[in-house]
Amino acid sequence: MKATLWGGLCAGVLLLTSASAQVLKPLPPIRTASGVVAGKVLASGVKAWLGVPFAKPPVNDLRWMPPQPIAWQGVWNADRKMPECMQVLRPHDINHYFGEEATGEDCLYLNVWAPARATAYSKLPVIVFYYGGGGTIGSAGSGMYDGEAMAKKGAIFVNIAYRLGILGYMAHPELTREQGGHSGNYAGLDQLAGLKWVHDNIARFGGDPAHVAITGQSAGTGAVSTLIHAPLAKGLFQQAMVEFVEDG
C-alpha cells in the first residue's frame, strides 16, 4: 500500500483537487502543542483541519522577522482556509490557474486532511506539500493543492503557507544587523516552521512523524531542495520528492 502511494504521488499530486464538500459534522477537538483545534468531516468522510496557525502573524514588529511560535487559549475553529500571503498582482491569463482568494499579511497557516479511518497515533504516512508560484504568487488554499483526494488514498496530507515576494525574501543591511548577521530568507524559515509543526503535532491527527515525505510544485520544489540540505530540517522528514523546478 505504502509503495503504491509513494510511487503514484509524483504523477498525481497536482491533479488532487476535490469538489466543494458538504460538511457532515464537526470533529472532536485535538490538543496540539500550541492549543486546541477543532476540524470538520467532509462529505467523503475525510477529516479536515483548515487554517491552523503554525506561527504568530508576521505583522508589525514581526514583519521581516523569523516566524515566532504561537499559542492560544480556548478552541481554534479550523473549518476554513485562511487568506493567502500578500503577493504581486497576477496576470489575467493565469487567474484561472490560481483562482481568486483573499490576501493578507496574517497568513502563516496550514491545512491538514486525514483519511476517515484516521485516529490519534494511527501512524499513517504523511505528505507535506509546498506550493509553487516563483516565490511571488501562490497559496496553500488553492483548490488544485487540496488534499482530500490524497487523504482518501490513505495518507495524511498537509500544505503549508509561506511569505512571498518582498515580505518573504528581502535582505537589507539594517535587517541583517538586527538579526545577527543575516536576513532575507523569511519564506524558507516559514517553510521550516511549518514542517516542525508537522513533526511535533501530526501524530495527534493520525500521522507518523517518522514517515514524512516533503514535496512541492515549481518554487515549492525549490523549497524541498533547500530543506534537503538544511541542517535545521534534519530529522523533520524522511523522504523527499523533487517533481519540477526551473533552472535559473
Segments predicted by a language model, with ranges:
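Short glycine-enriched nucleophile-adjacent loop
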Residues: 221-232
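Bacterial N-terminal signal peptides
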Residues: 7-17
